[in-house]
């Protein structure tokens, strides 16, 4: 075979990645060898979380931009311009469902409900609000909703375990309600003292509900092992991943130029048979959004040897 400049560069890049980067994706039956470059024919699926990028888009713009950039899923954040809220009428909900279905675009919803308050009236308000939001999700064809834990006292505080148990019990009630509607409840790795995998694991244990899932949010502690609870200190990415791998239903992505070990995470997800979406959740709205989405997708695929 004649060696072209492209083949040479591809082969060199893959060889270097295999040596230097942990979690390098090795050849499989789904991968096709092309001139020494192993092409991943089954990459993970990319989506958009309308945190800042997309916050000012209406539904038509979301569909147009996601189709143009080949994103397969959108997580619609509450209060943003697309207006997918519990105030929608039955006819409006049916219209939202039809528009996304016709576009071939999967959707989830992102709420801000949380379950740590010691005020029982406030806690019940959040639980009931979650159930109302789950009904909205079912009506518009969403596959799941995002919720928060959203805070626990520091270790050593005698109320810590009580709050963790309260969060777990509340989430369990919501998860059962959601399952009856065909909608997943996904608690995000987020909040004060709850933005790490071991604490999310503890919450899942307290919930003891097979219908409760989680969102992997890419906290630095995932790979540094810093700031984790007693008994988990220094735990690495793979060990933390294994704690929750059967409960991950969504992943939030940050900028790919960060220090987070993306290639290793993508490899772990692939090996675990992850079928969900990875949604970009970037903090800069000032960029040229469509161009950024296209470039992000290139980096996302390149880190999986999928282009």
Annotated model-derived regions:
Residues 89-94, 126-131, 160-171, 230-238, ...:
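Charged helix-capping and loop-helix junction motifs
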